[in-house]
């Protein structure tokens, strides 16, 4: 089965588009996938969104972090007839929320589980887009995809991942991810 790990960055911030209700107006700046078939990354820009959507649709499973609540919603205006929310998807943030009843960040899970950190933030990614620093933007997105992939693989192999609580203590959460 081809597993596709996916993340995207946007051209705008919520404050630029009038809030979360206008998520589709954020617009894709950069997206990155990693596929188990190729064991490699692919970078997509806004003009490449049709190819990105085709790759997501061809996946046996899509893996992401907040992909259902964010990434798929950002993609909706590019493919209004596609039903991305019905793709076979493991949204790691959503899965952890169902167990914990609160949201955890990718950075918290990455630091606690892997000892890795995100290299920047979504705000920084928008700034890089606006400054034309496309290599930095795509490298940042690749790092997020790689971290997400490694968290998924860790959870598959060990049956748990970890996160840092608001008090800074490392906590373990059981996962039952199909691998």
Residues covered by each model-derived region:
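Conserved RNase H-like, two-metal-ion catalytic cores of nucleic-acid enzymes
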Residues: 1-57
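A residue-level signal for conserved active-site and pocket-lining positions in enzyme catalytic cores
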Residues: 7, 110, 144, 148
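Hydrophobic side chains within alpha-helical segments
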Residues: 30, 74, 94, 147-148
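Conserved DEDDh/DEDDy metal-dependent 3′-5′ exonuclease domain
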Residues: 36-108
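Generic detection of short hydrophobic beta-strand segments and adjacent strand-loop junctions
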Residues: 43-44, 173-175
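A polyampholytic, Gly/Pro-enriched intrinsically disordered region
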Residues: 103-119
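Anionic, Ser/Thr-rich low-complexity intrinsically disordered regions
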Residues: 111, 174-179
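Acidic, Mg2+-coordinating catalytic module of metal-dependent nucleases/exonucleases
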Residues: 115-173
């Amino acid at each position: 089965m081809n597993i596709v790990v996916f993340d995207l960055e946007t051209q705008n911030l919520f404050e630029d588009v009038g809030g979360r209700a206008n998520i589709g107006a954020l617009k894709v700046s950069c997206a990155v996938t990693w596929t188990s078939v190729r064991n490699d990354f692919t970078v997509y820009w806004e003009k490449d969104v049709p190819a990105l959507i085709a790759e997501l649709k061809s996946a046996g499973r899509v893996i992401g972090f907040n992909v259902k609540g964010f990434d798929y919603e950002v993609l909706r205006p590019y493919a209004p007839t596609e039903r991305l929310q019905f793709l076979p998807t493991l949204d790691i943030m959503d899965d952890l929320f169902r167990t914990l009843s609160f949201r955890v960040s990718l950075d918290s899970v990455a630091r606690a589980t892997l000892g890795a950190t995100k290299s920047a933030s979504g705000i920084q990614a928008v700034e890089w887009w606006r400054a034309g620093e496309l290599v930095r933007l795509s490298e940042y997105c690749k790092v997020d995809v790689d971290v997400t992939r490694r968290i998924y693989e860790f959870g598959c192999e060990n049956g748990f991942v970890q996160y840092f609580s608001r008090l800074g203590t490392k906590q373990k959460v059981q996962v039952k991810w199909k691998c």
